[in-house]
Design a protein with these regions (language model features):
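N-terminal start-of-chain detector that recognizes signal peptides
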Residues: 1, 50, 134-138
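Conserved SAM-binding loop
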Residues: 2-87, 163-168
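S-adenosyl-L-methionine-dependent methyltransferase catalytic module, highlighting the catalytic core
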Residues: 59-62, 66-68, 72, 76-168
Length: 168
């Protein structure tokens, strides 16, 4: 089984959608990311695209422990999220791109999209590749690497990061 946790309305072929909001059309499992009703070591891959930044730092330990519980040994965890360092560099350099919303590469990466009006869509913690790799290592993940981003066209390459790790 492969999970797309925090799927929203995005269906990904080969992945089972998980979201805490029942109205999300792609969610086949309605559950919080820190309490998914599946057996231990029953998942071969977890993908969480633009989800991990929505947790407070103190929640991240519980969330990652749940995902580790679900993954088989050697199972893959893929996280894609804003890179706080790139967001800050974009602010300091004055890099403003994104069409109608020129602050997508900077402030949106830090705070989230201000148009939602939904407190759960706010970003609650920022990560850099270094801090996220250290966090995952601390939680027993191995073979941690940074890969080119694949989602969020506005942020690809200039704002976001993609980290892939394996459960140790």
């Amino acid at each position: 089984m492969k999970l797309n946790i925090g799927c929203g309305s995005r269906k990904v072929p080969g992945f089972t959608g998980v979201d805490a909001v029942a109205e999300r059309t792609a969610a086949e499992i309605v559950a919080r990311a820190d309490n998914i009703p599946l057996p231990d070591q029953s998942v071969e891959e977890i993908m969480a695209i633009h989800l991990f930044e929505h947790f407070y730092r103190w929640e991240c330990d519980t969330v990652i422990a749940e995902w580790k519980r679900l993954l088989i040994p050697g199972g893959v965890l893929t996280l894609e999220l804003p890179n706080l360092k790139k967001c800050c560099e974009n602010i300091l350099s004055g890099r403003m791109e994104g069409g109608k919303h020129p602050d997508q590469l900077s402030y949106w990466g830090i705070y989230g999209d201000p148009r939602h009006g939904d407190q759960f869509m706010a970003h609650r913690w920022g990560w850099t590749p270094e801090t996220l790799k250290a966090f995952l290592t601390e939680h027993g993940f191995v073979k941690i690497k940074e890969e080119p981003t694949q989602c969020h066209p506005a942020g690809r390459n200039h704002r976001d990061m993609r980290i892939v790790a394996r459960r140790g």
